[in-house]
Curated annotation (Swiss-Prot):
The name this protein goes by in its record: Glycerol-3-phosphate acyltransferase 9
Keyword Lipid biosynthesis on entry: yes
Assembly behavior: Self-interacts. Interacts with LPAT2 and LPCAT2.
Entry's transmembrane regions: 79-99, 102-122, 135-155
Positions of region (Catalytic): 168-180, 266-275
Chief place of localization: endoplasmic reticulum
Gene label: GPAT9
Lineage: Eukaryota, Viridiplantae, Streptophyta, Embryophyta, Tracheophyta
PANTHER family: GLYCEROL-3-PHOSPHATE ACYLTRANSFERASE 4, ISOFORM D-RELATED, PHOSPHOLIPID ACYLTRANSFERASE
Length: 376
């Protein structure tokens, strides 16, 4: 039998049907050869620079990764370590968690049994009342840290009450305030929160001079700026603590510092906070998790390990702008805590890109197409 038997032999006429001659469909005298110098379709669709920019933004998104939790590396998925992991889960949830809940409840009982009478009976003695309330706030924050089995190591001199000074720190979670507050009763600048956190803000934390604002209200900025200036001038005011990033970052990066804290004409005392993620990631992603669930996550971990550095106070240099001063302090905090600096505004986390930004990108792309047309 011939070797070609069983194979489909395609005739020339069949090939002609599959691949018709384009010239047969053109008017007489026309040719498919384009005149030299004309724009080809290949040139018009050459958008490789735009695609390169878009792909680069996806692959190396230095903004989004500032607000992502780092998943722990799996270590227990083998036959030898998995039983140990299961035993650890039982210990953390069935032994440590109930003990920590009892510790926190006991702390609240002591705190409220003292705070309410002091607030009611010492209304006319503001100096004494504020001093006792300051001690009580430090105490309840210590109970909170104990409920996570917090292992916190402080470096440097303890903050003191002095006029015309402000403390600034990098921000990972709302527990930053608790970790710092157990050592010194700071008056903090904080976003107004709903629920039980908002109740504590408007009652207990109000007693130490904390200042609240609503990020969505533009008029709050002027009110807060005035309160800041008045607070730093007070000789008896609690030390003022500001988180100039304005949002929680995952403790691997620092975003831009707001310049408001650096234009108060006072001494700035930097504080660097670094969490060890060996047991739990202390980063609070407020978009995905409530603060209550965040606390439960901490209370069911083995421990929260943290280091705090009180760095050398800084003053603005001659000829230095507020933005330059803020960047210099950010350099100090980033270097001490081992954090990477990124040139992003943390408030972009709460807002969508402006339509003007999209219009500028569209205009830039249109200009590149027009420039290519003019070249032809």
């Amino acid at each position: 039998m011939s070797s070609t038997a069983g194979r489909l032999v395609t005739s020339k006429s069949e090939l002609d049907l599959d691949h018709p001659n384009i010239e047969d469909y053109l008017p007489s005298g026309s040719s498919i050869n384009e005149p030299r110098g004309k724009l080809s379709l290949r040139d018009l669709l050459d958008i490789s620079p735009t695609l390169t920019e878009a792909a680069g933004a996806i692959v190396d998104d230095s903004f989004t990764r500032c607000f992502k939790s780092n998943p722990p590396e799996p270590w227990n998925w083998n036959i030898y370590l998995f039983p140990l992991y299961c035993f650890g889960v039982v210990v953390r949830y069935c032994i440590l968690f109930p003990l920590r809940c009892f510790t926190l409840a006991f702390g609240w009982i002591i705190f409220l049994s003292l705070f309410i009478p002091v607030n009611a009976l010492l209304k006319g003695q503001d100096r004494l009342r504020k001093k006792i309330e300051r001690v009580l706030v430090e105490m309840i924050c210590s109970f909170f840290v104990a409920s996570w089995t917090g292992v916190v190591k402080y470096h440097g001199p303890r903050p003191s009450i002095r006029p015309k000074q402000v403390y600034v720190a990098n921000h990972t979670s709302m527990i930053d305030f608790i970790v710092l507050e157990q050592m010194t009763a700071f008056a903090v600048i904080m976003q107004k929160h709903p629920g039980w956190v908002g109740l504590l803000q408007s009652t207990i934390l109000e007693s130490v001079g904390c200042i609240w604002f609503n990020r969505s209200e533009a008029k709050d900025r002027e009110i807060v700026a005035k309160k800041l200036r008045d607070h730093v001038q007070g000789a008896d005011s609690n030390p003022l603590l500001i988180f100039p990033e304005g949002t929680c970052v995952n403790n691997n990066y620092t975003v831009m510092f707001k310049k408001g804290a650096f234009e108060l004409d006072c001494t700035v005392c930097p504080i660097a906070i670094k969490y060890n993620k060996i047991f739990v990631d202390a980063f609070w992603n407020s978009r995905k998790q409530s603060f209550t669930m965040h606390l439960l996550q901490l209370m069911t971990s083995w421990a929260v390990v943290c280091e705090v550095w009180y760095l050398e106070p800084q003053t603005i240099r001659p000829g230095e702008t507020g933005i330059e001063f803020a960047e210099r302090v950010r350099d100090m905090i980033s270097l001490r805590a081992g954090l990477k600096k990124v040139p992003w505004d943390g408030y972009l986390k709460y807002s969508r890109p402006s339509p003007k930004h999209s219009e500028r990108k569209q205009q830039s792309f249109a200009e590149s197409i027009l420039a290519r047309l003019e070249e032809k």
